Amino acid sequence: MSTVNNSTVNDTTVQGTASELEALDALAAALGDALSVDPLDLAPLTADKSGHDSRSLPLALVTARSIADVQATLRIASELRIPVVPRGAGTGLAGGAIASAGQLVLSTLAMDRILEVSVADELAVIEPGIINADLNAQLAPSGLWFAPDPASKAIATVGGNIATNAGGLLCAKYGVTREAVLGLKVVLADGRMLELGHRSVKGVTGLDLTALVIGSEGTLGVIVEATVKLRPLPTGAVATIAAYFPDVTAAAAASAAITAAGLRPAAMELLDARSLRSIDRFLGVSLSERGSTLLLVQTDGAASEAEAAAALEVIVGLGGDAELTYDAVVGEELFAIRRAFHPALEAEGTVLIEDVAVPRSALPAMFAAITEIEERYGIPIPTVAHAGDGNLHPNFVYTPGPDGEVPEIIWQAADDMFRAALALGGTLSGEHGIGILKRRWLADELGADQLALQQQIRAVFDPLGILNPGKA
């Protein structure tokens, strides 16, 4: 059993093992005020947006301001076997950036610069801490944009988007984060830095380690710089359709039919009856009086008007009560309804947000499975979906137990839901990642051999296992 000792670090008294205190002394000497052991700074690091909380303060926080800071931190942590949790803005929904006792949090939030924008090559070189929406605001005068758009884009970092391979409302047309990254600089657990990828559009030299790191949730290394692919801002009118259906199965069938017709809306979002009722209560509106399910479809680009007309024809033909608008303000107001979904649920209790994805043609079957699970367990599961790519977000609203734990009945229902998604040819996670919350189901999807291989790959990058232990 390790002996607990006292020490003073940056004028704050701390307790820890001999190696922990040695690490803190070394970090303080190397990084100065970039190191904090102040409980007020550490308290927010025990949670993210998933609703999970470790309820134990981490050892310390390093706020890195440069690649050198990251390298120094990891060298010291590696030498003294201190576990490190990389963290951006803490907006993750799977517990991937949550820290607990004895762990060192390495934040890249202060590394938030755009280092280069090349209009000719349609790329930008950025630091990981830049906020997604801020990046696009700064790119707009160049007529370019970074396409990945998670719902948290106003508060999430691009580094976090890369670490989780984030998706978003527009990814059915424009792709997920992996498709928008050309290259990375990644610091390994021992402090060495890898320069991965390239600036060219094409490149097939060696194994694609860039793609491997994207979505690895901080388990292979710490992303300290990214070369990202940009797109010209879409031109032409933006059309928005709001379509109400009598039930979620009909709306899901309409979204699948739009895809089957060869149409590629920029965004296609589906909100079920429970979602609409929660939003009604939160916003003081009466959406659910129009229909029990809302399907939002938005088209952009040169073919926007033709695509919108074709989508509208499909929707009306399948019984949708639909309106089409080219008014940008009205379109934004309609999608603000979708963005109000999670705040509406958070106003009702603690929320466990799930993230299954199925083939688009299986959306009606997955919604039917969720309805069956609701009835089986007697619990509501309000669900929204990125219908354009088959990614559903079933939500469980609950009252935590005395120690903050999720009630077992919620996990039982989630277990049935994951198995239903896998049976339909889907996945546990379309865009949020595995983190802490979905680890217990990882083997169900990957199988023993693939899971073992992934663990071996992780050990090659991080032989001591100090990076984000206990995660994906």
Over which residues does each language-model region extend?
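Noncatalytic alpha-helical scaffold of FAD-dependent oxidoreductases
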Residues: 1-472
